[in-house]
Amino acid sequence: MIVCAASNNAGKLKELRRILEQMGHEVKSLRDLCIDLDPEETGTTFAENARIKAEAFCKASGLPTVADDSGLCVDALNGAPGVYSARYAGEGHDSAANNAKLLREMEKIPDERRAARFVCSICAVFGDDDIVQCDGACEGTIARRLHGQNGFGYDPLFMVGERSFAELDGPAKDAISHRGRALAALYEKLK
């Protein structure tokens, strides 16, 4: 099946493409489809924002569309940055600024209170009344410094055991990540 991967985030698009193509789908990016659209994410949950994006891009592309909304939820910060993960340091800031803010916020938090999880909600829209939603999560901890060169976003700070997401190669990350788990659940539902 040809699928529109509804993301303007290069890192997410790379993961969506890698996982969906392994599932046998041909993935078209927004750039491939010449779609220049940035729907406002007004939802208060990952699921609501994923659905907003999936519906908008399905309508624009005319193709079955898979969108995700995901982020980092840190226990010691009452779930922050959560749905505001991409904008944690403010509008117009990048991953480096978000990571720097997270490190500042976590500076005095002891090791035993550094639990966090990446959360992902995937929404697949095939038409007006044909919508499938799945979620995935990955438990970990927040490091005290950046680790690794792979990945994107908060990956250099998110530790699973002794390694950060940014120290894992793509297939190793996909096997345990929030996005990999959400897409695996979607695959099972679609079978």
Language-model segments: residues:
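Anionic-ligand binding patches
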Residues: 2-4, 10-29, 33-191
